[in-house]
Amino acid sequence: MQTSPLLTQLMEALRCLPGVGPKSAQRMAFTLLQRDRSGGMRLAQTLTRAMSEIGHCADCRTFTEQEVCNICSNPRRKENGQICVVESPADIYAIEQTGQFSGRYFVLMGHLSPLDGIGPDDIGLDRLEQRLAEEKITEVILATNPTVEGEATANYIAELCAQYDVEASRIAHGVPVGGELEMVDGTTLSHSLAGRHKIRF
């Protein structure tokens, strides 16, 4: 079926979103045009503004429309002395929702991957090293993903922290709450056993 060129362009543009295939893009385009043109206009305007105005925080590299994000500019966060290193801005949102961390962050925007030509400077480790040298950081919490690349990245950063006498710790990976042991993979179970803690009464 031949569609209008502009409609085809709209569907192709929507396919840049993760998980959106041809059918989903078609459904989204038709929904916006048939039922929610005002919503479509609002989406277009907000998307245009976001693409032109949102950049990276000068300190932690997360997304923000300011030079320094709200977390990094918070005096209480600075006094905490902890920096949590994550792979993406989405990880910050996940950790913030727990309400268990009151320090600042550093976003790598990826991980080390020599096979893909991604080295330390490509993920901002030169900037992290500068912060280790200049700021009063007491602990770096490594919250990279539990993948081969994530572990390699965490180990590299831990060695970097040691050069500046800054404590480095790795977040625990283990059995999910409500999970059954027989369904957990061996690597996760190994991490759980290694990271066990004593029960005190």
Swiss-Prot record:
A GO molecular function held by the record: DNA binding
Alphabetical keyword list: DNA damage, DNA recombination, DNA repair, Metal-binding, Zinc, Zinc-finger
SMART domains in the cross-refs: TOPRIM
PROSITE patterns cross-referenced by the UniProt entry: TOPRIM
CDD domains on file: TOPRIM_recR
One Pfam family named in its UniProt record: RecR_HhH
Zinc finger (C4-type): 57-72
Domain Toprim, residue spans: 81-176
InterPro entries: DNA_Rcmb_RecR, Rcmb_RecR, Rcmb_RecR_Znf, TOPRIM_dom, TOPRIM_RecR
Biological process according to GO: DNA recombination; DNA repair
UniProt cross-references to HAMAP family, sorted A to Z: RecR
Homology family: Belongs to the RecR family.
NCBIfam families for this protein: recR (TIGR00615)
Purpose: May play a role in DNA repair. It seems to be involved in an RecBC-independent recombinational process of DNA repair. It may act with RecF and RecO.
Protein name: Recombination protein RecR
Lineage summary: Bacteria, Pseudomonadati, Pseudomonadota, Gammaproteobacteria, Enterobacterales
